Amino acid sequence: MSAKTEEILESLKSLSLLEASELVKQIEEAFGVSAAASAGVVMAAPGATGGDGDGGAAEEKTEFDVVLESFDAAAKIKVLKVVRNATGLGLGDAKALVESAPKTVKEGIAKADAESLKKEIEEAGGKVTLK
């Protein structure tokens, strides 16, 4: 790997979740591409190799996204603490994430972890869906 690409990679590793999201939007605009389109293709590919067709119905989803849909205004600080703890975001980034609900808190996590995080956020006063 060249020194330039290593430097870029290290810079990307230090981005917060919100900064990474902003970067994706800027890249999409600058190059006229869509990150969502390629993700849809990747998600469709496993079903394409399903074989006889009814194998897909028996498959259970293994990765989930935890989405904060809304929260009780009186419980905002509690929800913020849970989200901050779960994501490792700084206070400002976690606050921005919570205030911009509905927003994905964590992506591609195991079912047990997703259900545990959902329970924590709901106990703190948030409304959560798993996708």
Curated annotation (Swiss-Prot):
This is Large ribosomal subunit protein bL12. GO terms for cellular component: cytosolic large ribosomal subunit. Pfam families: Ribosomal_L12, Ribosomal_L12_N. It comes from Prochlorococcus marinus (strain MIT 9312). InterPro entries: Ribosomal_bL12, Ribosomal_bL12_C, Ribosomal_bL12_C/ClpS-like, Ribosomal_bL12_oligo, Ribosomal_bL12_oligo_N_sf. Forms part of the ribosomal stalk which helps the ribosome interact with GTP-bound translation factors. Is thus essential for accurate translation. Gene3D superfamilies: 3.30.1390.10, Single helix bin. Keywords: Ribonucleoprotein, Ribosomal protein. GO terms for molecular function: mRNA binding; structural constituent of ribosome. Homodimer. Part of the ribosomal stalk of the 50S ribosomal subunit. Forms a multimeric L10(L12)X complex, where L10 forms an elongated spine to which 2 to 4 L12 dimers bind in a sequential fashion. Binds GTP-bound translation factors. Belongs to the bacterial ribosomal protein bL12 family. GO terms for biological process: translation.
